[in-house]
Amino acid sequence: MKKLLISALALFVVGSVAAQEGLGETYNKAVAAYNSKDFASAATAFETLIDQGLDSEDLDVQSWVATAKKSVPVCYFQMGLTAAKGNDFNTAVENLTKSANKAALYGELQQERMSNMLMAKIYLMWGGKPFNEKNYAEAAEIFAKGYAADPKNMEMANFLGICYCELGDFQKGLVIFNEIASQDNPKYAEDVVKVKENIKLYTNNRIAKLQGENDFDGIIAVADEMLAVNPQDALAQKIRLQALFDKKDY
């Protein structure tokens, strides 16, 4: 009985060594592919290593898995970047989404941020064509995805707000515009100036139309929409008071 137990233990040790050697080969294959910029093959090999070595107690394997977790998001990032350079935006977004998700899963927060920022820039380029063609519905759909990826992309946000206003959804556009206008970081100063101009432009256009129709209740409703988004909106308060005065309802 003892002999059988010893044999079983010996087989277990041999099996563990063989498994480690197999993972070592996978690791070397992944590193070689990564260094040669074959990021698709590298990602596949690194993910295989993670799947097979995740529960290993071997210190070498744990080190390989840790490297793999850092490398997988980078692989997908590079694949997304390459696709973007070729104007293959669908593939670029697909790979960058994988990069961001893998980075979040493995705790690589800086890489997650980088992937989302690049994704937003791609959406910005992607939406530029329909925006310039005044196809605001298509542009808004694209820009909204980019804004979700990186809410700090103020240029993207401004274009999205414009799309909503052009589509007649003034309040939705105003929510975006006010988000930009509330930024106090100096690097967004130019964006804040632009968006305040847009708020005035679209507000004045709506008010002018309603004034031409002597629709004072409509003007008050516009002001109320603005105040619902930002209760401290001085422009909205002024518009409302003026409309009440013109209506002689005070």
Spans of features found by a protein language model:
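TPR-repeat structural position
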Residues: 39-40, 89, 136-137, 170, ...
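N-terminal leader/linker segments that initiate helical-solenoid repeat arrays
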Residues: 2, 18-97, 102-106
